[in-house]
C-alpha cells in the first residue's frame, strides 16, 4: 500500500508466490488480487484491518484481473477455464460463477462501471487489441477502439469516459515502442492522447476527479 499524501509504503501479506492486479473493494476495507503459484492463478481477498486472506476461486485454471461491482456483491474476472481467456462474473464469495463473454477472440482486464450496468474489457482478435464494453450479462458488446496493442481500461467517475494505455511503434521498422495513455468516450468518439512526461501504462482514475 502507498499513502499518496505521505509517500509511506507498506507491504501487506507474505505470499509464497506472485501477487498481481490488486484492486480495492468499494468500501475500501479489502483488497482483491490474483495469486499465482505452481503454474496456476486464483483470486484472493485480504481484509485490510485484520490481514485475513480468503481464497475466492479454486480452479485448475488461470483466474486473473478481478474487479468488484460497485455494490460489492459481485466480482468480474477473466479465466481460461473454457480453454482460453474469457470474462466471468461470480458472487463476492466465489459462488455462482457464470461466463458472460462469447464473442470471437480472447478477453481480459474486465472492469465494472461506476453505475454497475457495464463492464469494460480488452479483447484480442485477429492480431489486434480492442477496448470495449458489454452489459453485465454479456449482451450488447461494443468495441470502441482498435490498435496494435492496448489494454487496461479504467472508468472515469461519471462513467462516460474510459482511459487506457496503448503501445505504438516508434519507427517504420518496428524496432521500438512507446506506451502512452489515451481516453475515449463511451460513445466511441473523442479519442484523445493524455499527455505525460514519460511513457505511461496501467492507468487508474481517481474517484476525486471527473470529466
Which residues does each predicted region cover?
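Sequence signature of WD/YWTD-type beta-propeller architectures
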Residues: 1-211
Amino acid at each position: 500500500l502507498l499513502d499518496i499524501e505521505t509517500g509511506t509504503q507498506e507491504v501487506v501479506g507474505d505470499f509464497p508466490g506472485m501477487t498481481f492486479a490488486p484492486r480495492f473493494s468499494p468500501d475500501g476495507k479489502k483488497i482483491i488480487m490474483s495469486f499465482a503459484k505452481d503454474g496456476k492463478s486464483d483470486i484472493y481477498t485480504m481484509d485490510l484491518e485484520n490481514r485475513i486472506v480468503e481464497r475466492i476461486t479454486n480452479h485448475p485454471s488461470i483466474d486473473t484481473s478481478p474487479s468488484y461491482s460497485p455494490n460489492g456483491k459481485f466480482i468480474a474476472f477473466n479465466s481460461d477455464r473454457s480453454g482460453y481467456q474469457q470474462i466471468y462474473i461470480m458472487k463476492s464469495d466465489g459462488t455462482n460463477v457464470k461466463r458472460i463473454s462469447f464473442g470471437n477472440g480472447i478477453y481480459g482486464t474486465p472492469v465494472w462501471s461506476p453505475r454497475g450496468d457495464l463492464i469494460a474489457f480488452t479483447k484480442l482478435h485477429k492480431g489486434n487489441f480492442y477496448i470495449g464494453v458489454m452489459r453485465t450479462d454479456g449482451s450488447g458488446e461494443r468495441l470502441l477502439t482498435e490498435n496494435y496493442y492496448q489494454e487496461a481500461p479504467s472508468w472515469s467517475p461519471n462513467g462516460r469516459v474510459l482511459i487506457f494505455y496503448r503501445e505504438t511503434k516508434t519507427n517504420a521498422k518496428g524496432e521500438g515502442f512507446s506506451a502512452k495513455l489515451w481516453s475515449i468516450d463511451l460513445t466511441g468518439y473523442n479519442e484523445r492522447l493524455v499527455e505525460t512526461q514519460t511513457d505511461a501504462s496501467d492507468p487508474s482514475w481517481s474517484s476525486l476527479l471527473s470529466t
